[in-house]
Amino acid sequence: MKPITPLAAYIKQPLLALPISLLLVACGNGSNVAGSDNSGQNPTPTIAPSQPDPAPTSAPVLSYGRLAVAEADQTNVRLLDLDSGNIAADISLQNPASALYRSPQSGYVVAIQRNQDKVEFIDSGLLASQPEAPSLHSFSIEQAKPTHFDLSSTAASLFFDGDQGAGINAGFQVLTDSSIKQAKALASHDFTQAMHGTAQLRGEFALTTFRSDVATTSLPDQVVVMHQHNDHYHEEKTITESCPGLHGSMQGIHWTVFGCEDGVLAIKQVGEEFSAIKIPNIATMVDTRIGTLKGSHKHDKFLGLTRTQQAFLVDPENNLMTEILWRDQPETTFLAYGVDHHQAHFLMLDSKGYLGVYEIEEDFKRVAYIKVLDSVPNLNSGQKFNITSSGSQAHVYISDPVNNNLLTVDLTSEAVIKQLALAFSPAHIAWVGIEKEPAAHQH
């Protein structure tokens, strides 16, 4: 095993006044999604096996996990060990990552390289009986335009948009930590067309997308229900209700929702039966549409976001859409957002330097508003703040690409508890490790 590199090799000199042991210790979320969600200012579109794949339980050593930090415009991904405060590994990908996600059971970093048609996987090193150094898995996937990575409770769908100009069709693959370890997908499906689509996995079913003959862009306009048969899928039915310009999706207990140009398509599952309704856009939604949907697998109300920085509560059970007035001043914008690891909170970093914490089960009520940035830097072209959170503690991580900082926010104390100055510009971030169910929280 390679020796662990001291964190000082990757941080600016001089260091902050605090010693390294205090700069980065216990760790503490968007996917999509559960897990990390590295979204920027503009919301853009990001199955489960028949037998659930259990979370890893082989590691008896308690660990706060590791934080994967991609260097902007470089192939490097550093894994920060959150127990020792050191760099556990500096992994070199084939190409710069366009996104980082945690795997379904949080044992691997999923490194998307969309423009190069490639996905690589980093083993966290925490799944063995004793912690090991992280390593780049020999398993990789090469398929055109990997884009959306959507987590269900036990698996993840990785959607490939394909390339219409090159005659390459779209498809999706179903992954679990077990299948990644075995260097294969659990199941897959190939379409007969290219499209910027998505797939939501519900047990042995997949709700995925299709472009009809009347679709005029790369965005789909229909939802198809598919049924898993071992390592592949068969089409069960096409949902009659259309969804022009479909973009963004999320699932709850019974409902799965998709953003459309004219509203939100909501599909309810009862046993093996699926029925749909369309919730139309409301009058306060001016010259825009919902393009991103967030929520929890344990709740059937969802948050819809638009490019014009509006937010809406989507309630399919009551066929309602209601605007959430999340900002006190019209000029306030969101810089980054995501859902925490256990899907209890929606997190939003705004342009005033505050982290808003919204309770999902209380219809996205704001329950905390934490000052995390004394001043908000101007972002250069291509730069974004990114948010992820821990699966073992109530900690949120925010990367600042301008000041090359990594902030740790404790949701219990509602304060920034660590600030790490890096020697590189951080881009995407993701937490990996052994998950721990959170204690009951109060606000």
Spans of features found by a protein language model:
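C-terminal motif of bacterial Sec signal peptides marking the signal peptidase cleavage site
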Residues: 23-26
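Bacterial signal peptide processing site
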Residues: 28-31
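Repeated scaffold domains used in trafficking and secretory/extracellular systems
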Residues: 53-59, 95-108, 140-154, 188-204, ...
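Post-signal peptide N-terminal segment of secreted/secretory-pathway proteins
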Residues: 72-170
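A short beta-strand motif characteristic of beta-propeller blades
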Residues: 86-92, 128-141, 145, 180-191, ...
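Long, acidic/polar, low-complexity amphipathic helices and coiled-coil-like
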Residues: 129-259
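Acidic, serine/threonine- and glycine-rich low-complexity intrinsically disordered segments
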Residues: 207-341
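Blade-level signature of beta-propeller repeat domains, shared across WD40, Kelch, NHL, RCC1
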Residues: 401-407, 411-443
